Amino acid sequence: MRYVIDPPPTPSLPVRGGGLFPVRRVYCIGRNYAAHAVEMGGDPNREPPFFFQKNPDDLDASGRFPYPRRSRNVHHEVELAVALAAGGEDIPVERALECVWGYAVAIDMTRRDLQDEAKKLQRPWEIAKAFARSAPVGELVPASTIGHPARGAITLAVDGELRQAGDLAQMIWKVVGLTGLNRSRASVVVAEGLRTSDQ
């Protein structure tokens, strides 16, 4: 059966060495860094990370971030992006990493003033988290070339000034556990691994 209108192009991310990775869903995982979980009133030893979604169209590998409208307070958090090529029900933990196609560095942009307003009104945060170009992402690096990093520095600088610095080893829920919580293929899981030093 034919579409009645032309379907939109498939969102995708560039791959180091060439090619594109198609993206169907983007799951974001918060409170995955102990200090940040405590700061947000959670218990890092008990509470699993919560999930929310960004629109795949919000992914942006252009290297530019136009300041969004309707906000005077945009915050940034550097993240680890995990690209999944497979998914399914009841994936054994020991096989979870087989679902991972590659990794990238990403940034979660938040219109913090709109988020605070939504919290006060007990409304969803979507307007603060899911907006155009709210998920800058670097090029994907295949796991076949770098393996599955469990540790390693991840940093963010603004105009040359270091704003975030940490190590992947500081994540409460490791990639293998986060992969097991997600059952979709052609997805990107953006895992919070750091606390923003200036927030």
Stretches found by the model and what they are:
Residues 48, 78-80, 101-105, 133-135, ...:
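Generic beta-strand structural signal
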